[in-house]
Amino acid sequence: MTPQDFFENNGYWIESEPLFSSQDLAEYRQSMTDIMNHKYESGREPMAGRNWPERQDLQGMVQINNAWWAGGAIRRLSLNRRIGKIATQLLQVNGVCMWHDQLLYKPPAKSKTLSGNIGWHQDWNYWQVCDHADLITAWVALNDVNIQNGAMMIIPGSHRWGQAMEASERTLEMDKTASKVKIPRGEKWKIVHCELRAGAVSFHHAKTIHGSGPNHSDQPRLGLAIHMIADHVRYTSQGIYSHSNLKVCPRKEGDLFRGHQHPVIWGNETE
């Protein structure tokens, strides 16, 4: 079975061999540290996210939106052409553009707090300003990621379930949220843990249900989610939700997603 066939059937793919060297990873981690400490090589602050720019919950997940704005090594990683090429091949499209990225810092859970969790969800619920669901996420492990430190969990095949849950049903209580999912007849709720060595990358479809639990290790879990959009997808105002990208890069009905917020990562315009 080819990677494309596996992705089409399961809604995810894991590049198990690291794509990046130890030196690359050291640069990415340092860049992440700089951004979390409000040091931006480009001079531009990323968009506000969860528990950031003011970190009020030291045990809570830190999620920094559009971290690539800050420049430096994280920007280079977010626009990495090798990742873009794999994403293009998995979606079976002509090319992909940046949608947005998210730096993810999951601290060790020193109590039974849920604030380090990312509840079960489908990205597509929040991205319906797009006229097609041809979007994909590359999740880059910046250190080793395993079950103990809260590896992302995926429900294989759930990208074929349509809108299986409402955005309003998402909570940090994993079991409670799972009980709300509309599972089609004949399908099963099966969890796959995306355990990755540092430098390895997983990919998942915009409709694939995913989430992550607490970090029970003694070190933070570090990752970068690069959300990419197929180069043929256009803006529509028919979606239920708007999107924060539109605040910095407004669109007219039917516009392609291009420009400073949506550079081409892989495709004819980069070759």
Describe each model-derived feature in a short phrase.
Residues 42, 46-50, 55, 201-203, ...:
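Non-heme Fe(II)/2-oxoglutarate
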Residues 121, 128-147, 195-196, 203, ...:
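Short, conserved beta-strand element in jelly-roll/cupin
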Residues 86, 124-129, 140-143, 187-193, ...:
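Short helix-to-loop capping/linker segments positioned immediately adjacent to catalytic or ligand/cofactor-binding
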Residues 106-108, 155-162, 221, 227-233:
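Short edge-strand/loop segments of extracellular domains
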Residues 1-10, 16-120, 128-129, 167, ...:
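Non-heme Fe(II)-dependent double-stranded beta-helix
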Residues 47, 116-122, 171-188, 220, ...:
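Short, surface-exposed loop/helix-turn segments at secondary-structure junctions
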Residues 110, 116, 120, 130-131, ...:
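A short secondary-structure junction signal
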Residues 145-209:
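Double-stranded beta-helix
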